[in-house]
UniProtKB/Swiss-Prot annotation:
Highest taxon listed in the record's lineage: Eukaryota
Record's protein name: Motile sperm domain-containing protein 3
GO BP annotation list: heart development
Gene3D superfamilies to which the protein is assigned, alphabetical: Immunoglobulins
Lineage, opening ranks: Eukaryota, Metazoa, Chordata, Craniata, Vertebrata
GO cellular component: cytoplasm; membrane
Domain spans labelled MSP: 33-145
Key words of the record: Membrane, Transmembrane, Transmembrane helix
Pro residues: bias regions: 149-164
Amino acid sequence: MRRGAPQDQELVGPGPPGRGSRGAPPPLGPVVPVLVFPPDLVFRADQRSGPRQLLTLYNPTGTALRFRVLCTAPAKYTVFDAEGYVKPQSCIDIVIRHVAPIPSHYDVQDRFRIELSEEGAEGRVVGRKDITSILRAPAYPLELQGQPDPAPRPGPPAGTPPPTARHFQEHPRQQLATSSFLLFLLTGIVSVAFLLLPLPDELGSQLPQVLHVSLGQKLVAAYVLGLLTMVFLRT
């Protein structure tokens, strides 16, 4: 088939020879709208179950109609239920399968024709509609399809910084912990020293008067020492 010129090809389908071919006269009498969905057929060459489409044909009238599916390239397609009847105010699904999904057929436009006629062997055609069909190439090369994806390498947990950043973060934390420990230790030593110093009115002390502490200072030192003890016990 020549690309882009499906109108130059003869429509072939079931039925007597010559019926529904190129140059067929328009339907006589009342015209029935041919309602189909989708309006165009797009096949994908990489469909897992094979390139196929479901065409739904509606009959909006109050009488049963005979339908027939014609195609410009019948060798490339298989049409299930290419001819039959549609009940009044009902619909029927027609499965169309592309049987030649080869690279030379990619982006080649074909044409289907849906004809509706009255019941009976010689029923006159009351409506027809042409729809285009095209085969799209696979989204990925065929040689890459079917191959399992390589197993992803296990990475660090979410929220975990890279090793370099983590290395720089651990050092400040260690330094902060060391500084806090030294501060607590120094505060504890000072508190113990305050508790060991004599009161101002204590007799027999050989320390100078400046090293005598009040009872309030001893209470504060005891309170601070108790807090430090609780911190050490929790850690």
